[in-house]
Design a protein with these regions (language model features):
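Conserved helicase NTPase motor core
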Residues: 1-18, 71, 156-253, 270, ...
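P-loop NTPase Walker
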Residues: 1-90, 280-283, 593
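ATPase/helicase motor core of nucleic-acid motors
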Residues: 78, 258, 326-458
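Conserved RecA-like helicase ATPase core segment
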Residues: 218-306
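Accessory C-terminal helicase-associated subdomains
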Residues: 388, 392, 433-544, 557-559, ...
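C-terminal accessory regions
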Residues: 553-668
Length: 668
């Protein structure tokens, strides 16, 4: 693969197979052979990967005294460069770039939703607006016009309301001269196809994480390919975890070979990250996805062993206390399906005073809307005012969010006025609300009455769980999520407040201790960090000595729509489609293959799982279980026997087809 120079190539790489190192060596080899840097383009999936690859490539170039390195870009940054050049040549109209999720974009979505549904209202169902947002994004990335949706029989089942909304969306973008990041990709492809634009002549195009590309990104690669261009793509179908935004496993499992003739296949099937037990259980889980059969991971014989442990009903606090005794100097990741699941470990780490960081945009718990609501309610209950959070830099945002989450009925402009007034006079919140809010309005009267009553409730107990119960009984959490029109955000907020209840019922935390953690969390020196908190999606491409997976109740992952009610947190099961389950299984595969030394999975107590292991089964349960179905598929008992067989080939074990295949791959 390193010496491959002519013809297209598809590299299928398992986790930890050293694909980045191999790609660096290949690019370095091309440069050493005299291939001009400007004739090579390397496309990465995201900014972090782009920066990391560029840094490593520069180090390699310096080692061999190479004067320059090729362009290493993300798809969007490269497409934006083409669009800007098109604008300079007057081939494309100048438009303002608007970020999806920005207030301007959210307002545009609202307008389209109202138009599509032929209503005049200020209320938007969160699930409906997110459905519209995802549909619009995918339609734009598939280059579909409103006419396509109306005239093509393939789209006859799409709701007419969504078709009207999409038509309005396209019209508004043109009217306001706006473009999104999705549009940048489409416009770049259209520019290349126009034959009016001089496409850069590239001899080598390398695309990393190809399993995550969508239709328009694939079209961009095709558009950049000329007779002299050699394209190499690298990826792993088992790590395709972005289907919800257009990625498809078949781009790497068939489409590339269809579009790029005479493709040579390279398989990097040996991992240098983890030991045989983890390789085996990962193979066992992912084998349930029928499109994964071409990929089979084995560990390099010199890899150290990786232990896989399933903990039923174990408290995270207990595991961390034990981990501190055993792995004082190891790196550890606590990984969950959603950001809401990470609330518990963050508070536990604060209680234990262990150095950690959160790998997400919201660096502090109080920056989560539902947690800031809980925090301010507790301040009002204990202190009667908000003076305790004076040191907080984003106080005005906290006040605004507090008012929005409580869902006072306010006339236009009053939200800002009320926010500003309370921000200036934190000690007089009740009088300000009484003065500026129409308390005669029924909902406002109920909310104000509840706020006044919670102060007297605080004397009943100094435990945070007791106060939470009071807030919940008074309905102060009922309107959580209304501050966001995006369903994925609102669901996460509902889930977050629900997990706070579980946490406070599990640990005895006083109100003052909880407020100290939420308002003034202990911050740690970056060089001393030993714990990372991240979602499964956020863990991709990373590795740690130890990985702890949490939130593994089957109702929560993968078998739900992530919409818990309050306070009955997880009683909301629904069946996911087969494709959804495949993607969630791939996500689980990504998460477990981040571990080097030890993989811990915390699951609820489940007698069915004990029965499964006793019978040495690895099939997917057909009946409801407590633990996620994916741990049933791990074939953990056989994996342990396999490790003993590898250590001592004379050991006799009962071979299954999968364990025999693994041993054959090792020539044992």
């Amino acid at each position: 693969m390193i010496k491959h120079t002519h013809g297209h190539a598809l590299v299928k790489a398992v986790p930890g197979s050293g694909k980045t190192t191999t790609l660096i060596m290949r690019v370095t080899n091309l440069l050493k052979q005299g291939v001009e840097p400007q004739s090579i383009l390397i496309l990465m999936y995201n900014k972090a990967a782009q920066l990391s690859f560029k840094k490593k490539l520069q180090t390699s170039a310096d080692k061999y005294n190479l004067s320059a390195i090729p362009d290493v870009r993300t798809f969007h940054s490269y497409a934006l460069e083409l669009v800007k050049e098109g604008q300079r040549l007057n081939l494309i109209t100048y438009k303002e770039l608007v970020e999806q999720g920005s207030p301007k974009y959210q307002q545009l979505l609202r307008e389209c939703y109202f138009y599509g549904n032929e209503i005049e209202s200020s209320f938007v169902e969160n699930n409906e607006i997110e459905k519209l947002e995802l549909n619009i994004s995918n339609w734009r990335l598939e280059e579909l016009t409103p006419n396509d949706l109306n005239q093509d029989p393939n789209y006859k089942d799409i709701d007419k309301k969504d078709k009207r909304a999409y038509k309005k969306y396209c019209e508004l973008l043109e009217q306001y001269k706006l473009r999104t990041f999705d549009d940048i990709l489409s416009e770049a492809v259209q520019l290349i196809r126009s034959n009016k634009f001089s496409v850069p002549v590239l001899k080598q195009v390398i695309v990393d994480e190809y399993q995550d590309v969508n239709y328009i990104q694939n079209e961009l690669v095709k558009g950049l390919t000329q007779p002299v261009t050699n394209v190499m793509v690298v990826g792993d179908v088992n790590q395709c975890i972005y289907e919800w935004r257009g990625s498809r496993p078949d781009f790497i499992e068939g489409i590339f070979e269809r579009d790029f003739k005479n493709t040579k296949i390279f398989n990097l099937s040996c991992t240098f990250r983890y030991g045989h037990q983890l390789s085996y259980v990962a193979n066992s889980v992912i084998s349930k996805n029928k499109d994964s059969n071409s990929s089979f991971c084995i560990s390099h014989p010199k890899n150290k062993s990786t232990e896989v442990s399933i903990h039923q009903g174990l408290n995270l606090l207990k595991l961390l206390e034990h981990s501190e005794k055993e792995n004082k100097f190891s790196s550890t990741a606590i990984i969950a399906r959603s950001n809401a699941d990470l609330i518990e470990p963050e508070i536990v780490l604060q209680l234990l005073n262990l150095p950690y960081r959160v790998k997400s945009s919201q660096q502090k718990l109080i920056s989560r809307p539902e947690i800031s609501l809980l925090t301010l309610l507790m301040c009002l209950a204990v202190d009667g005012d908000l003076s305790r959070i004076k040191p907080t830099a984003n106080f005005q945002w906290l006040i605004r969010n507090f008012i929005k989450q409580l869902d006072f009925r306010l006339p236009k402009g009053m939200l800002n006025e009320l926010t500003l007034a309370i921000s200036k006079n934190k000690d007089n919140i009740f009088n300000i609300i009484k003065e500026k809010v129409d308390i005669k309005q029924e909902q406002n009267r109920k909310i104000f009455k509840s706020l006044k009553e919670i102060n007297s409730s605080s004397s009943c107990s100094n435990m945070a769980s007791a106060l939470y119960k009071v807030f919940n009984e008074k309905g102060l959490f009922l309107n959580i999520s209304e501050s966001s029109i995006l369903r994925r955000e609102s669901n996460d907020q509902i889930r977050g407040i629900s997990f706070m209840q579980q946490l406070l019922n599990t640990f005895e935390i006083t109100v003052n201790d909880l407020l100290d953690i939420l308002i003034n969390p202990t911050e740690h020196d970056e060089n001393k960090i030993r714990y990372d908190l991240t979602t499964m999606h956020g863990s991709k491409g990373l590795e740690w000595d130890n990985v702890i997976l949490i939130g593994l109740e089957d109702k929560a992952y993968p078998g739900t729509n992530n919409e818990p009610t309050i306070p009955k947190e997880l009683d909301f099961i629904r069946t996911k489609s087969n494709d959804d389950l495949k993607e969630e299984r791939r996500l689980f595969y990504v998460a477990i293959t981040r571990a080097i030394q030890h993989l811990h999975l915390i699951v609820p107590t489940d007698k069915t799982l004990d029965h499964w292991n006793k019978n040495v089964w690895s099939s997917t349960p057909k009946k409801e279980t407590n633990a996620t179905r994916f741990v049933f598929e791990m074939d953990l008992v056989i994996s342990r026997s396999l490790v003993e067989k590898i250590k001592d080939p004379k050991t006799k074990i009962e071979l299954t087809p999968r364990s025999k295949r693994y041993l054959d791959a090792l020539s044992l």
